[in-house]
Amino acid sequence: QNIAVKLLEAIKYPNYDDVNLAPYHSSFDARNSALSRRTVQIYQELGLWSALQEHATPILEVNITEQGSFGKARLKAEQEKVESFGQVIENAWLGRVLLTEVQKQPLIELIDGVQVTQLTQDADMAYIDASRGEEQLSLQAKLVIAADGRDSFCRKALGIGASEHDYDQVAIVTTVQTSKPHNHVGFERFSSLGPLALLPLPGEYRRSVVWPVKKGTEGEWLGDENDQHFLDALQDTYGDRAGKFQKTGKRFSFPLSQVLAEKQAVGRVILMGNAANTIH
Protein backbone atom coordinates (compact mmCIF):
# COMPACT_ATOMS: atom_id res chain seq x y z
CA GLN A 1 0.00 0.00 0.00
CA ASN A 2 1.34 3.43 -0.97
CA ILE A 3 1.58 5.96 1.85
CA ALA A 4 1.85 9.71 1.27
CA VAL A 5 4.52 11.36 3.43
CA LYS A 6 5.08 14.99 4.35
CA LEU A 7 8.68 15.48 5.47
CA LEU A 8 9.16 18.56 7.67
CA GLU A 9 12.74 19.83 7.98
CA ALA A 10 13.96 22.71 10.11
CA ILE A 11 16.72 23.79 7.74
CA LYS A 12 16.33 25.26 4.27
CA TYR A 13 17.65 22.93 1.57
CA PRO A 14 19.09 23.65 -1.86
CA ASN A 15 17.27 22.11 -4.80
CA TYR A 16 19.20 19.16 -6.21
CA ASP A 17 17.32 17.98 -9.29
CA ASP A 18 20.11 15.53 -10.05
CA VAL A 19 23.00 14.57 -7.83
CA ASN A 20 25.28 14.59 -10.89
CA LEU A 21 24.41 18.08 -12.16
CA ALA A 22 26.78 20.02 -9.90
CA PRO A 23 30.28 18.60 -9.29
CA TYR A 24 30.94 17.56 -5.71
CA HIS A 25 34.33 18.19 -4.17
CA SER A 26 35.50 16.75 -0.86
CA SER A 27 36.04 19.45 1.75
CA PHE A 28 38.85 19.28 4.27
CA ASP A 29 36.45 20.78 6.79
CA ALA A 30 33.73 18.23 6.06
CA ARG A 31 32.13 16.36 8.94
CA ASN A 32 31.83 12.60 8.59
CA SER A 33 29.74 9.69 9.81
CA ALA A 34 30.70 6.08 10.46
CA LEU A 35 28.05 3.75 9.04
CA SER A 36 27.63 0.25 10.44
CA ARG A 37 27.56 -2.77 8.14
CA ARG A 38 23.81 -3.08 8.65
CA THR A 39 23.25 0.56 7.68
CA VAL A 40 25.25 -0.02 4.49
CA GLN A 41 23.08 -3.08 3.76
CA ILE A 42 19.93 -0.98 4.13
CA TYR A 43 21.25 1.59 1.66
CA GLN A 44 22.11 -1.27 -0.72
CA GLU A 45 18.56 -2.61 -0.44
CA LEU A 46 17.24 0.88 -1.22
CA GLY A 47 19.46 1.10 -4.30
CA LEU A 48 21.38 4.09 -2.93
CA TRP A 49 24.76 2.62 -2.07
CA SER A 50 26.24 2.83 -5.58
CA ALA A 51 25.98 6.63 -5.35
CA LEU A 52 26.92 6.91 -1.66
CA GLN A 53 30.08 4.83 -1.94
CA GLU A 54 31.66 7.37 -4.30
CA HIS A 55 32.68 9.36 -1.19
CA ALA A 56 32.84 6.57 1.39
CA THR A 57 35.75 4.51 2.69
CA PRO A 58 35.54 0.99 4.15
CA ILE A 59 37.07 0.17 7.53
CA LEU A 60 38.97 -3.09 6.94
CA GLU A 61 40.94 -3.20 10.17
CA VAL A 62 40.66 -1.74 13.68
CA ASN A 63 43.65 -1.27 16.00
CA ILE A 64 43.18 -0.45 19.70
CA THR A 65 46.12 0.77 21.80
CA GLU A 66 46.80 2.55 25.09
CA GLN A 67 49.38 5.28 25.51
CA GLY A 68 52.29 4.02 27.58
CA SER A 69 51.34 0.37 27.10
CA PHE A 70 52.90 -2.22 24.78
CA GLY A 71 49.72 -4.26 24.33
CA LYS A 72 47.25 -3.77 21.50
CA ALA A 73 44.19 -5.39 19.97
CA ARG A 74 43.82 -5.82 16.23
CA LEU A 75 40.66 -6.82 14.38
CA LYS A 76 40.62 -7.59 10.66
CA ALA A 77 37.47 -7.79 8.56
CA GLU A 78 38.96 -10.59 6.47
CA GLN A 79 39.55 -12.74 9.55
CA GLU A 80 36.02 -12.02 10.78
CA LYS A 81 34.73 -13.06 7.34
CA VAL A 82 32.97 -9.76 6.69
CA GLU A 83 33.46 -7.35 3.81
CA SER A 84 34.23 -4.49 6.20
CA PHE A 85 33.46 -3.27 9.74
CA GLY A 86 31.59 -0.31 8.28
CA GLN A 87 32.10 2.72 6.07
CA VAL A 88 33.07 6.32 6.78
CA ILE A 89 31.23 8.84 4.61
CA GLU A 90 31.23 12.61 4.31
CA ASN A 91 28.00 14.02 5.76
CA ALA A 92 27.61 16.55 2.95
CA TRP A 93 27.61 13.78 0.34
CA LEU A 94 25.33 11.53 2.38
CA GLY A 95 22.80 14.34 2.77
CA ARG A 96 23.02 15.31 -0.87
CA VAL A 97 22.35 11.80 -2.18
CA LEU A 98 19.46 11.23 0.24
CA LEU A 99 17.91 14.62 -0.50
CA THR A 100 18.13 14.01 -4.24
CA GLU A 101 16.36 10.67 -3.83
CA VAL A 102 13.63 12.21 -1.63
CA GLN A 103 12.94 14.85 -4.28
CA LYS A 104 12.43 12.11 -6.87
CA GLN A 105 9.70 10.37 -4.87
CA PRO A 106 6.15 11.35 -5.95
CA LEU A 107 4.62 10.34 -2.61
CA ILE A 108 7.04 12.42 -0.49
CA GLU A 109 6.50 16.16 -0.09
CA LEU A 110 9.52 17.90 1.44
CA ILE A 111 8.63 21.06 3.37
CA ASP A 112 11.82 22.72 4.55
CA GLY A 113 12.58 25.75 6.72
CA VAL A 114 9.82 24.69 9.13
CA GLN A 115 9.52 25.23 12.88
CA VAL A 116 6.94 23.08 14.66
CA THR A 117 5.06 25.16 17.23
CA GLN A 118 2.43 22.69 18.47
CA LEU A 119 1.81 18.94 18.45
CA THR A 120 -1.42 17.43 19.76
CA GLN A 121 -3.40 14.27 19.09
CA ASP A 122 -6.66 12.46 19.71
CA ALA A 123 -7.73 8.88 19.17
CA ASP A 124 -7.99 9.29 15.40
CA MET A 125 -5.36 11.81 14.34
CA ALA A 126 -2.22 13.77 15.25
CA TYR A 127 -2.15 17.52 14.60
CA ILE A 128 0.82 19.77 13.90
CA ASP A 129 0.98 23.56 13.81
CA ALA A 130 4.14 25.00 12.30
CA SER A 131 5.60 28.17 10.84
CA ARG A 132 7.59 28.59 7.65
CA GLY A 133 8.77 32.15 7.61
CA GLU A 134 5.59 34.23 7.54
CA GLU A 135 3.51 31.23 6.48
CA GLN A 136 1.51 29.29 9.08
CA LEU A 137 0.92 25.58 8.50
CA SER A 138 -1.67 23.23 9.99
CA LEU A 139 -1.19 19.54 9.25
CA GLN A 140 -2.79 16.31 10.38
CA ALA A 141 -1.80 12.68 9.97
CA LYS A 142 -2.62 9.24 11.30
CA LEU A 143 1.06 8.74 12.14
CA VAL A 144 3.77 11.24 13.11
CA ILE A 145 7.41 10.18 13.33
CA ALA A 146 9.31 12.72 15.41
CA ALA A 147 13.07 12.69 14.78
CA ASP A 148 13.87 16.22 15.94
CA GLY A 149 17.02 15.66 17.98
CA ARG A 150 18.13 15.33 21.58
CA ASP A 151 16.24 18.49 22.62
CA SER A 152 13.11 17.25 20.84
CA PHE A 153 10.26 19.77 20.85
CA CYS A 154 7.84 16.98 19.96
CA ARG A 155 8.91 14.86 22.92
CA LYS A 156 8.36 17.76 25.29
CA ALA A 157 5.06 18.74 23.66
CA LEU A 158 3.74 15.24 24.34
CA GLY A 159 4.86 15.43 27.97
CA ILE A 160 7.30 12.55 27.58
CA GLY A 161 10.04 12.74 30.17
CA ALA A 162 13.66 11.83 29.52
CA SER A 163 16.57 10.77 31.69
CA GLU A 164 19.81 12.60 31.00
CA HIS A 165 23.43 11.90 31.89
CA ASP A 166 26.13 14.48 31.26
CA TYR A 167 29.57 12.95 30.70
CA ASP A 168 31.28 16.32 31.43
CA GLN A 169 33.12 15.97 28.12
CA VAL A 170 32.98 17.43 24.64
CA ALA A 171 34.13 15.70 21.47
CA ILE A 172 36.55 17.54 19.21
CA VAL A 173 35.84 16.47 15.62
CA THR A 174 37.91 17.31 12.56
CA THR A 175 39.71 15.99 9.48
CA VAL A 176 43.49 15.64 9.35
CA GLN A 177 46.10 14.76 6.77
CA THR A 178 48.92 12.37 7.63
CA SER A 179 52.16 11.47 5.89
CA LYS A 180 51.36 7.75 5.93
CA PRO A 181 48.36 6.29 4.06
CA HIS A 182 45.55 4.98 6.24
CA ASN A 183 45.20 1.67 4.35
CA HIS A 184 41.56 1.52 5.51
CA VAL A 185 42.60 1.06 9.15
CA GLY A 186 40.68 2.65 12.02
CA PHE A 187 42.49 3.37 15.28
CA GLU A 188 41.42 3.95 18.85
CA ARG A 189 44.08 5.23 21.24
CA PHE A 190 43.43 5.60 24.97
CA SER A 191 45.35 8.45 26.59
CA SER A 192 45.31 10.68 29.67
CA LEU A 193 43.40 13.29 27.62
CA GLY A 194 40.74 10.80 26.59
CA PRO A 195 40.21 8.16 23.89
CA LEU A 196 41.33 9.27 20.43
CA ALA A 197 39.67 7.76 17.34
CA LEU A 198 41.15 7.98 13.84
CA LEU A 199 39.01 6.74 10.95
CA PRO A 200 39.96 6.44 7.27
CA LEU A 201 38.44 8.85 4.75
CA PRO A 202 38.34 9.02 0.94
CA GLY A 203 41.81 10.02 -0.16
CA GLU A 204 44.48 7.73 1.24
CA TYR A 205 46.05 10.34 3.54
CA ARG A 206 42.88 11.85 5.03
CA ARG A 207 41.51 10.74 8.40
CA SER A 208 38.59 11.71 10.59
CA VAL A 209 39.47 12.55 14.21
CA VAL A 210 37.14 12.23 17.20
CA TRP A 211 38.77 13.24 20.48
CA PRO A 212 36.73 13.63 23.71
CA VAL A 213 38.19 16.19 26.14
CA LYS A 214 37.03 17.56 29.48
CA LYS A 215 34.26 20.13 29.18
CA GLY A 216 35.66 23.64 29.51
CA THR A 217 39.02 22.79 27.93
CA GLU A 218 37.80 22.66 24.32
CA GLY A 219 38.77 26.29 23.68
CA GLU A 220 42.40 25.20 23.77
CA TRP A 221 41.89 23.16 20.59
CA LEU A 222 39.49 25.31 18.56
CA GLY A 223 40.27 28.23 16.26
CA ASP A 224 42.70 28.57 13.35
CA GLU A 225 45.40 30.00 15.61
CA ASN A 226 45.52 26.65 17.45
CA ASP A 227 46.10 24.45 14.38
CA GLN A 228 49.72 23.62 15.13
CA HIS A 229 49.03 23.18 18.84
CA PHE A 230 46.33 20.64 17.98
CA LEU A 231 48.57 18.79 15.51
CA ASP A 232 51.39 18.66 18.06
CA ALA A 233 49.02 17.22 20.69
CA LEU A 234 47.86 14.55 18.25
CA GLN A 235 51.46 13.68 17.45
CA ASP A 236 52.43 13.43 21.13
CA THR A 237 49.41 11.28 21.94
CA TYR A 238 49.41 9.05 18.91
CA GLY A 239 53.10 8.72 18.08
CA ASP A 240 54.25 7.90 14.56
CA ARG A 241 51.77 5.14 13.66
CA ALA A 242 50.08 7.45 11.17
CA GLY A 243 53.30 9.23 10.26
CA LYS A 244 53.39 12.99 10.70
CA PHE A 245 50.15 14.88 11.29
CA GLN A 246 50.55 17.50 8.56
CA LYS A 247 47.30 19.42 8.29
CA THR A 248 44.04 19.88 10.17
CA GLY A 249 40.67 21.18 9.09
CA LYS A 250 38.33 23.30 11.18
CA ARG A 251 37.57 21.74 14.55
CA PHE A 252 34.00 21.29 15.78
CA SER A 253 32.98 20.52 19.36
CA PHE A 254 29.95 18.57 20.54
CA PRO A 255 28.83 17.94 24.14
CA LEU A 256 28.74 14.28 25.14
CA SER A 257 25.65 13.15 26.99
CA GLN A 258 23.01 10.45 27.05
CA VAL A 259 19.31 11.24 26.72
CA LEU A 260 16.80 8.40 26.96
CA ALA A 261 13.07 9.04 26.47
CA GLU A 262 10.79 7.36 29.01
CA LYS A 263 8.52 6.29 26.15
CA GLN A 264 9.23 5.95 22.45
CA ALA A 265 5.62 5.83 21.29
CA VAL A 266 2.53 7.64 22.54
CA GLY A 267 -0.74 7.35 20.66
CA ARG A 268 -0.10 8.24 17.04
CA VAL A 269 3.41 9.63 17.55
CA ILE A 270 6.67 7.67 17.47
CA LEU A 271 10.00 9.10 18.61
CA MET A 272 13.01 8.09 16.56
CA GLY A 273 16.72 8.85 16.41
CA ASN A 274 18.19 11.20 18.98
CA ALA A 275 14.70 12.27 20.05
CA ALA A 276 14.24 8.77 21.48
CA ASN A 277 17.76 7.83 22.51
CA THR A 278 20.89 9.95 22.30
CA ILE A 279 24.16 8.18 23.06
CA HIS A 280 27.02 10.68 23.02
Segments predicted by a language model, with ranges:
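Glycine-rich FAD cofactor-binding loop and adjacent beta-loop-alpha segment at the N-terminus
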Residues: Q1-L60
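Glycine-rich, N-terminal phosphate-binding loop of Rossmann-like dinucleotide-binding domains
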Residues: N15, D148-G149, I279
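Short beta-strand to alpha-helix junction loop
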Residues: A34-R37, Q79-T100, E218-N226, L256-L260
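Conserved N-terminal helical subregion
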Residues: L52-A157, H165-V170
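Short gly/ser/thr-rich secondary-structure transition/capping motifs
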Residues: D124-Y127, K250-V259
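Central beta-strand plus flanking loop segment that forms part of the substrate or channel wall
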Residues: D151-G186, Y205, K215-T217, Q235-Y238
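Conserved FAD/dinucleotide-binding core of flavoprotein oxidoreductases
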Residues: S191-P255
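Conserved mid-domain beta->alpha element of the FAD-binding
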Residues: F254-H280
